[in-house]
């Protein structure tokens, strides 16, 4: 059998499909999710049901979002799952997750995310952080390292700062390429993202936060003084607790937010 065909379905490159087929890993992921009846569970990209089936054995109803028409059809006719699933056929990147929220029942989102869209998809989900209890995702290991990174490390970047702005990040388990059909060329890992009830460092303007973070990491080897020249004077940076001689890659989330909030307040005053 060809190594890109699994359970009679050929993996589609344009959808970034790699199907999980290692029972030990699947068991570890389902244990991490810990699904319970009555919870508002949403799976992104169920594929051939490697995680969907064991989750379905634990709960009576849940929602899946699948872009691949053939796979969505397969789930509609699944002997065990068909009666339990609400299937949304379409692109999770454009999906309004608010429509799935129920009173006092936040979303628990999980999935083996296509690696080619995982970062923009997470940014899309962060917009719904108030409606999400937690998220469990299989991602490229390098992306999980970035999500969990600390200031001054090579992996620390825009994704780190914005993920940690919204969520507590907990790496759960590492997954080798051999756990998939076809095997990807990279190692994978599962991460748990838990949105904060109250943001630890709230920004008064997400536009300003996004701007200072982007500009900082686009010029990560410059000093903070040079990176934000024209936005903030060195004296202002020092007042905010930021050393103008350090590099942006060494700034903490709290420092990025302090700078963004100062810029927001200053521009509102001058508006």
UniProtKB/Swiss-Prot annotation:
Tell me which domain of life the UniProt entry assigns to the organism this sequence originates from: Bacteria
Q: Where does S-adenosyl-L-methionine bind?
A: 18, 20, 45, 66, 91, 112
Kindly list the biological process annotations in GO that this record carries: rRNA methylation
Gene Ontology, cellular component aspect: cytosol
According to the UniProt entry, its GO molecular function terms are: 16S rRNA (adenine(1518)-N(6)/adenine(1519)-N(6))-dimethyltransferase activity; RNA binding; rRNA (adenine-N6,N6-)-dimethyltransferase activity
Which EC number(s) does the record attach to this protein? Answer: 2.1.1.182
What top-level class of enzyme does the UniProt entry assign?
A: transferase
Keywords, A to Z, come to: Cytoplasm, Methyltransferase, RNA-binding, rRNA processing, S-adenosyl-L-methionine, Transferase
Q: Which Gene3D superfamilies match?
A: Ribosomal RNA adenine dimethylase-like, domain 2, Vaccinia Virus protein VP39
InterPro entries linked to this entry: KsgA/Erm, rRNA_Ade_diMease-like_C, rRNA_Ade_Mease_Trfase_CS, rRNA_Ade_methylase_Trfase_N, rRNA_adenine_dimethylase, SAM-dependent_MTases_sf
Sequence intervals crossing the membrane: none
User: According to its UniProt record, which reaction does this protein catalyse?
Assistant: adenosine(1518)/adenosine(1519) in 16S rRNA + 4 S-adenosyl-L-methionine = N(6)-dimethyladenosine(1518)/N(6)-dimethyladenosine(1519) in 16S rRNA + 4 S-adenosyl-L-homocysteine + 4 H(+)
**Where is this protein localized, as stated in its record?**
Cytoplasm
- In the UniProt record, the signal sequence range is none
Would you identify the family this protein belongs to, as annotated? Belongs to the class I-like SAM-binding methyltransferase superfamily. rRNA adenine N(6)-methyltransferase family. RsmA subfamily.
Q: What does this protein do?
A: Specifically dimethylates two adjacent adenosines (A1518 and A1519) in the loop of a conserved hairpin near the 3'-end of 16S rRNA in the 30S particle. May play a critical role in biogenesis of 30S subunits.
Q: What is this protein called?
A: Ribosomal RNA small subunit methyltransferase A
Q: What is the lineage of its organism?
A: Bacteria, Pseudomonadati, Pseudomonadota, Gammaproteobacteria, Vibrionales
